[in-house]
């Protein structure tokens, strides 16, 4: 029986195919996951491309950080593997490693309401920028320019994905009030 293809909302991006590897149909991906051991031990199916074609994950090898070599069921020669170049590689969100209490998936932040701890609404998360040190959310504010808020404990009091909101403590100078004159 063929694996049902998940919707775009049900998958997480783990990488992108950058090339074929070897002659036996393995693919090389640039990974954006640090959960390689979980991928190796617990994930049985990956999905490739916009159409999210299912492939059985047979083997995962990490020759260096950020690069994975995958063996996929049905991909047995270099020509077939080369045809997958450029495809996004996803897994079902339910197959991902469980998150710790203070962790989140980036896609979960989009569209959340950002509320000041005093109760006033600041705006809605439009974009997430990954800086390496910490994530930064771009908050779209009605009638004002967007603002950037770092996702750090000093600023974020509560992140409640289920309630659709992020409650923040505004540190002095964190938001530019556009210097609007009355």
Curated annotation (Swiss-Prot):
Domain PRC barrel: start-end pairs: 101-174
A cellular-component GO term for this protein: cytoplasm
Disulfide bonds: none
Main location per the UniProt record: cytoplasm
UniProt-listed Pfam families: PRC_RimM, RimM
Keyword vocabulary terms for this entry: Chaperone, Cytoplasm, Ribosome biogenesis, rRNA processing
GO annotation (BP), single: ribosomal small subunit biogenesis
Subcellular location: Cytoplasm
Listed InterPro entries: PRC_barrel-like_sf, PRC_RimM, RimM, RimM_N, RimM_N_sf, Transl_B-barrel_sf
UniProt similarity note: Belongs to the RimM family.
Subunit relationships: Binds ribosomal protein uS19.
Function: An accessory protein needed during the final step in the assembly of 30S ribosomal subunit, possibly for assembly of the head region. Essential for efficient processing of 16S rRNA. May be needed both before and after RbfA during the maturation of 16S rRNA. It has affinity for free ribosomal 30S subunits but not for 70S ribosomes.
Name listed for the protein in its UniProt record: Ribosome maturation factor RimM
Organism (species): Roseiflexus sp. (strain RS-1)
Taxonomic classification: Bacteria, Bacillati, Chloroflexota, Chloroflexia, Chloroflexales
Gene (name only): rimM
């Amino acid at each position: 029986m063929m694996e049902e293809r998940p919707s775009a909302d049900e998958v997480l991006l783990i990488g992108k195919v950058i090339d074929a590897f070897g002659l036996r149909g393995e693919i090389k991906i640039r990974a954006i996951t640090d959960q390689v051991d979980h991928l190796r031990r617990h994930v049985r199916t990956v999905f490739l491309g916009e159409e999210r074609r299912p492939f059985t994950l047979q083997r995962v090898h990490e020759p260096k950080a950020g690069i994975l070599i995958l063996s996929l069921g049905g991909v047995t020669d270099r020509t077939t593997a080369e045809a997958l170049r450029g495809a996004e590689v996803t897994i079902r969100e339910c197959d991902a490693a469980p998150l710790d209490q203070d962790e989140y998936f980036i896609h979960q932040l989009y569209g959340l309401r950002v509320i000041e701890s005093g109760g006033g609404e600041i705006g809605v998360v439009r974009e997430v920028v990954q800086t390496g040190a910490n994530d930064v959310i771009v908050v779209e504010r009605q009638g004002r320019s967007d603002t950037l808020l770092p996702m750090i404990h000093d600023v974020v009091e509560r992140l409640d994905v289920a309630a659709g909101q992020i409650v923040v403590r505004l540190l002095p100078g964190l938001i530019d009030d556009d210097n609007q004159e009355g």
